[in-house]
Amino acid sequence: MDTIEYTEFSPPLAQRAAGLAQLGCASADGRTRLRRLYQDGSAKIRLPAVLADPLEAVLINTAGGLTGGDRIGWDVDVGTEASASITTQACEKVYRAASDQAEVRVKLTVGENGRIAWLPQETIVFDRAAFARTLDVELAAGAEALVLEATVFGRLAMGERASQGTFRDRWRVRQDGFLIHAEDFRIGPDITGALARPAAAGGVIAVATLLLVSPRAEALLDPVREIVGHQGGASVWSVKASGKLLARLYAGDGYQLRQRLVPLVGLLNGRAGLPKLWSL
């Protein structure tokens, strides 16, 4: 009797999202114009039909969210005396990870006397998500930057809370080759327990960090503190020939957080004001 041999098959690997998008702009004839646009995978960039100054760009993750093993990269290069305002089409969602972690890497480069506003909408972290984000900013002499990252751990209105998981956020900001700001935020695996600590967030689920590198930083400190209120704080330092204003905010949910982020971004983003997609 013939022997039947069985071949063992490994389970199919889950499909992972991967993408890289690069945007370059330069100043020409007194206006900021697109110089380079590259898109690969699920990372897309869209520009309004009517170009504005500063140049406006919208980032889109066509995968619809992130989960374990996904990799997304955003690279923005703003030339000398050019200006750009970057936001996202919607809130980025980080879903439960079966294995590995989702990673987002952001690189922002600004030439002399250029300006960038990095203003993505909130990142929503779901239960048992695993997420790591790195943000590297290189500023030339005289360059300005407004950088915001806001995170909401769960959606209370939907009865969802991110109780377990890991979240890592690493920032490095340099100007004229010198490190002027660095931070490493890590939370997990007990997210609820960590956020409940009085020295951490006091039980809230929505947090934001906003950094302004500009000679205007010191003059804006008092109005920033008025908007931030008692749920957060703001400080200012002199760095190189510029200034650095750092504000941190926390709130009971994403809606309450945005109620203060909207006027804060409008104040700090100069004539560009609030990104249009924030008000849709």
From Swiss-Prot:
Cellular compartment(s) = Cytoplasm
Q: Which InterPro entries match?
A: UreD (IPR002669)
- Which GO-annotated molecular functions does the record name? nickel cation binding
Which of UniProt's keywords are assigned here?
Answer: Chaperone, Cytoplasm, Nickel insertion
Its domain of life reads Bacteria
GO CC field: cytoplasm
Task: State where it is primarily located.
Answer: cytoplasm
Q: How does it assemble?
A: UreD, UreF and UreG form a complex that acts as a GTP-hydrolysis-dependent molecular chaperone, activating the urease apoprotein by helping to assemble the nickel containing metallocenter of UreC. The UreE protein probably delivers the nickel.
Q: Say which family it is in.
A: Belongs to the UreD family.
What protein name does the entry list? Urease accessory protein UreD
Organism lineage reads as: Bacteria, Pseudomonadati, Pseudomonadota, Alphaproteobacteria, Hyphomicrobiales
Encoding gene, per UniProt annotation: ureD
